[in-house]
Amino acid sequence: NLTDTGGSKAAAAALAQLAISAGLYAAPIIGDKALPDVGYWLPKDGVVSEFSSHNKYQLICITFYRSFLASEDMAAIRQLSAAFDFLGYQVVGIFAPTLKNPEYGSWIQQAIKTLQPVAIINATSFSSKGTDGSSPLDVSKTPIFQVALSTSNKKNWVDASRGLSPTDLAMHVVLPEVDGKIFSGIISTKEATKRDPNLQYSRFVHTPLDERIRRVSAKVDKWIKLQSKYREKVAPKVAIVLSTYPGKKWQMAHAVGLDALASAAAVAADCSLTNSDLVDIPTR
């Protein structure tokens, strides 16, 4: 049961039981060894059964995989939480094996409805939409920011012309963006820890990228401040910038397989529904 549960305390308790079975002394492992399938995580307290925000207008939710907790691979999530804490936000983590499971999704939906965070940072991969075409994160009326925990090491990421590998681009950028999430950057790479000579083993863990984490937290902070202008009835000025190719006027806003002009018109039309002062919106 302990090995099935996962988590550092359960692993320590399992090793203690093995030691006792071998006739060796092992100190008791204090604390709850069970790791729920879905729940809350706090930077200082770890997994908690209940959570209520003390400052709901400054709460940020970070959604991530339960497997990060089970394998004690939380350094990137901890550092991301610390970056938002430094900026004055309260942070709560919500973990689950997947966002697509209806049971877990229902729990997450209710949690987000209750907490009403000012932003959600998603650290899971791929699309989070289930068979009904919806994601449990959609219940939030706030932006959902996607971050990437790269499966490559830092050297490969730095040397690659596109940064993230094709697999990481699909997992962390393309499919989440199709869901409507805002890609905000990479926060970690996969690195080997120091080799244990006794176990003859090196763990590969998500290793935080300090400067990139600061960029992500700063970007989200600016989005939240921009939202506050709407609440204060001070409408910000928004521009849509489209790319082009020099000397090829027929390729204005060119995108492979996408109609960027139609997308821009649709975005402008949506903005007009939110009382934004827009005129002469093109029909295409």
Across the structure, where does each feature detected by a protein language model lie?
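An N-terminal assembly and electron-transfer interface module characteristic of large anaerobic redox
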Residues: 1-284
